[in-house]
Amino acid sequence: MIKLYLATALSVAFMIGFRKPQTGSKNFSVQQLAPGVWAAIQNDKGGHAISNAGIIDLGNKTLVFDAFMNPDAASELKRTAEQLTKHPVSFVINSHYHDDHIRGNQVFVPGASIISTEWTKNEMRKAEAEEQEWLRKNIGKSLEKAKQQLRSATANEKEEAVMWLGYYEGISQSLPILKTTLPDITFKDSLWIHGSKRSVLLIECKNCHTASDVVMILPQQGIAFMGDVLFVKRHPWFGDSNAESLKERLEDFYADASLTQFVPGHGPVAGKEAVQTLVSYINDLQQLATEAVQKNEADSDFIRQDVPAQYKSWWFGRFYSDNLAAVYHDAKKK
């Protein structure tokens, strides 16, 4: 029997080697991280998953971490999980409330319990109604803009432009069938889920990517499914974030010697160096903001600066000005 109970501590884990991604579909590829543990990595070439997910064989039950943005992509995730584990999906974890991680919930019920923090469930109820109403009125314009951007993209820009077109196509395709499916189990602080073979620890990370994010730890395997607390080779988005709190939380995960593999919400599976890289990114932006405030530079000028050379190759460059605005606002308050 699966037992769920609150807990606070991490356990010691051992190092697990990386596995190469297995052949996947238009929407995602599957990468085995350890026995019974897989990452489902979004396919950037026009796929509709948009974010990464996880599949865990608990032994007698199957757990999925994050549910993708598009219900059809989520249906494929569900089939893949059940083929790999030979058990139906019993638990789906929502790492946070953003659409690209929760709109696949509907394909897992009935049958699975959807789990999130209390704050995430409440925010999902409010935000999804507002966002879906806006999308139904505006998705046509957004989709056409994405097509135009792809047509005008340079050779270096084209690959990412294909990904963004897939994002808007996935939204457009899903809107007629979308049913907001809220979590039925919520928790605060932390939650263990124990299976006959493997256990996972859900940790609430407050004021990181959003006001409440979930990171899932497999202590014995040394694996962390980070949700959008971690982006790899992509600019994070600080629109809902507290950059300083996020940085401190990332430093905690970096300092945990038991953790060796990190699955980001966006980007490839990575080791600890990716965590430190994102910490450095936040430090760099904070330093730029501090200097701008000291020089009384207007925020409208500050946010127009170019991406630093070391981050030029990262995707999601459209988030950079938003991130500058966020750290500038924080620096002004000091």
Task: Give the role of each language-model region.
Residues 244-301:
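Divalent-metal (often Zn2+) His-rich catalytic cores of metallo-beta-lactamase-fold enzymes
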